[in-house]
A protein has these predicted regions:
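N-terminal secretory signal peptides that target proteins for export/translocation
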Residues: 1-6
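Bacterial N-terminal signal peptides
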Residues: 9-21
Length: 196
């Protein structure tokens, strides 16, 4: 049976920010610990491996980690400087015995309504892998309020993340998730009689 963390990440990222004093000392500056089972994971700034530079961040499942939860390192930024454009989140992930490791990006509108979302659910990183670059492309509509992004681990193993970058791309670059809201909608119904 496939366990999909799509629903948990959508719901719990709004309400499950976790402050764990003993872990916060190792959390990279600017990043937040969250997730439906963040207490089941160890988060760290890691100086033993990096895609480039000296450091990466890691998420490691504890031996008794919940089979239904996940832990994430994330950031949430104001969408003011990103509206009315298509944006690409890229980053490097490396895994060791990972059940599911995934990079993710979410665009929120008013009242925390999700307007664009991709968490690589159809293309998770599993097992043991070397440093590999991944990309997510989403639209940020004019009514966007926040952009959240990060990477997570579900169930078991370790994932490292490094060199995340958010950059504007042309509208010809395809979005990576069908949940993206088109940049504009038609003003009138089209082909209502199906003759075209």
């Amino acid at each position: 049976m496939k366990i999909s963390p799509v629903r948990p990440i959508v719901v719990t990222l709004f309400v499950s920010f976790v402050s764990i004093a003993s872990v916060l000392a190792d959390v990279p500056a600017g990043w937040i610990i969250a997730g439906s089972a963040a207490k089941d994971y160890e988060f760290a700034r890691d100086g033993t491996t990096a895609a480039s530079g000296k450091f990466s961040a890691s998420i490691t499942a504890k031996s008794d980690a919940s089979a239904n939860g996940f832990g994430t390192l994330m950031q949430m930024i104001d969408a003011d400087n990103y509206r009315d454009a298509r944006w690409k989140l890229s980053g490097y992930l490396k895994t060791s015995d990972a059940t599911r490791a995934q990079m993710w990006m979410r665009v929120d509108g008013l009242d925390r309504k999700i307007v664009s979302f991709d968490n690589m659910d159809s293309r998770p990183v599993t097992g043991t892998t070397g440093w590999t670059r991944y990309e997510i492309v989403l639209d940020v509509p004019s009514d966007s309020v926040d952009i959240a992004f990060g990477f997570f681990l579900a169930q078991a193993g370790t994932v490292w993340g490094d060199n995340f970058k958010l950059e504007k791309v042309e509208s010809t670059v395809p979005v990576t998730s069908p949940t993206s809201v088109p940049p504009s909608r038609p003003k009138e119904p089209a082909n209502a009689d199906f003759e075209n």
